[in-house]
Regions:
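N-terminal secretory signal peptides that target proteins for export/translocation
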Residues: 1-3
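Small-residue packing motifs within transmembrane alpha-helices
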Residues: 5-12, 333
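Signal peptide processing junction and immediate N-terminal pro/mature segment
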Residues: 21-30
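A structural signal for small-residue-enriched, beta-sheet-centric alpha/beta enzyme cores
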Residues: 31-106, 110, 121-358
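Bacterial N-terminal signal peptides
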Residues: 9-21
Length: 358
């Protein structure tokens, strides 16, 4: 029997990946899971976080210092983004050197300036005389309701996150851009929970790697696609069980309308792969990866969301790659990363995490 795919948090039934985040991964060769099952499983990708001490907020930086093909799909109706137009397939620049995910809403986009400074100091970017101009798209979540909203990530936060970036397994939970992330706000902030950063990856016997990192700051619930059960989300009146946002949306009348706080949300994702993709194909992968949001978040892509997914393709794996295959796998690992974000989160005063409800 041939080598089996390595699915971190997944199992294969027939040809379709099924999310089973509670089960251990099965190694392709040695019968073990890979040492790194996060975004940095893709060679050439580094991730760093910086979390502010003054309040729960911060930023997360994905470095691709060599410059890699990049695409994006901004699916939410209320995005806070920077340089995403540059990643359109019809525009000139084909690569990015980093992606910044930040708290602080639109103010947090300043974090990208610090990452640009970090990269220019290392002569990374497009050279124009004495200057080097790195391409650093960014997106931010709304977390101003957690702690003192006057405290926001800025350029120094981005610089420190870039300095901290490594190719080691990504630290998950309530760190970096996920420090102030919350979920379950459809029932009001008083019934919400802590969100955060999650990551997952898949490696096929062919050597293809597809990985995802996500910052979950959702209005509703995180759903485990393996069983359709709520993992974390809107808490019921007892503060321990779940109200189920899907039932709330169908109830009508009192309790059937998303609370105003349910409009203060955004989920941000980055897909990375060692496949060789064009800019158009990377954009398509971003589009397909949003299926992972739809599987693991209820609801997703609402008028109050700024949902964004970036894709980085390093091209390290030579030969032809089906962008459709990469996109389908990206949706799977994105869903897995979302579930991990909920499970790895840690609570702060007023916002319990899943582990606090047990």
């Amino acid at each position: 029997m041939g080598a089996r795919p390595v699915l971190v948090g997944f199992a294969l039934l027939a040809a379709a990946p099924v999310l089973i985040v509670s089960m251990p991964a099965i190694g392709a060769q040695a019968g073990r899971a890979p040492a790194n099952s996060t975004l940095t499983a893709v060679p050439g990708i580094k991730v760093g976080h910086h979390t502010l001490t003054e309040r729960p907020t911060g930023c997360t930086v994905v470095l691709a210092e060599a410059g890699v093909t990049a695409g994006v799909d901004v699916r939410g109706s209320a995005p806070a983004t920077r340089e995403t137009d540059l990643l359109s397939p019809v525009n000139l620049v084909q690569i990015a050197h980093a992606i910044v995910l930040s708290g602080g809403s639109a103010f947090g986009l300043d974090s990208a300036s610090g990452v640009m400074r970090y990269l220019e100091e290392r002569r990374i970017g497009f050279e124009f005389g004495p200057a080097h101009v790195p391409i650093v798209p960014a997106a931010a979540i709304f977390d101003l309701s957690v702690g003192d909203g006057r405290i926001r990530p800025g350029a120094d936060c981005g610089y420190q996150a870039a300095r901290a970036a490594t190719d080691s397994s990504v630290t998950e939970g309530s760190v970096g851009a996920g420090a102030g992330a919350t979920l379950g706000k459809a029932g009001g902030m008083g019934r919400s929970m802590k969100g955060g950063v999650g990551s997952a990856s898949i490696t096929l016997p062919s050597g293809l790697i597809v990985a995802a990192l996500v910052v979950v700051n959702a209005a509703g619930d995180v759903i485990d696609p393996a069983n359709g059960q709520v993992v974390a989300g809107v808490r019921a009146a007892d503060g321990k069980s779940f109200a189920d946002a899907r039932k709330m949306l169908r109830a009508g009348g009192p309790g059937g309308v998303i609370a105003p706080a349910g409009r203060q949300n955004t989920t941000l994702g980055v897909v990375a792969t060692n496949a060789r993709l064009t800019k158009t194909e990377a954009t398509r992968v971003s589009q397909m990866a949003h299926d992972g949001y739809a599987r693991a978040l209820a609801p997703a892509h609402t008028p109050g969301d700024g949902d964004v997914i970036f894709t980085l393709a390093t091209g390290e794996r030579t030969g032809n790659t089906d962008a459709g295959q990469v996109g389908a796998l990206a949706a799977d690992v994105m869903a897995g990363a979302i579930v991990r974000a909920a499970r790895q989160a840690t609570g702060v005063p007023g916002f319990p995490a899943l582990r606090d409800l047990k």
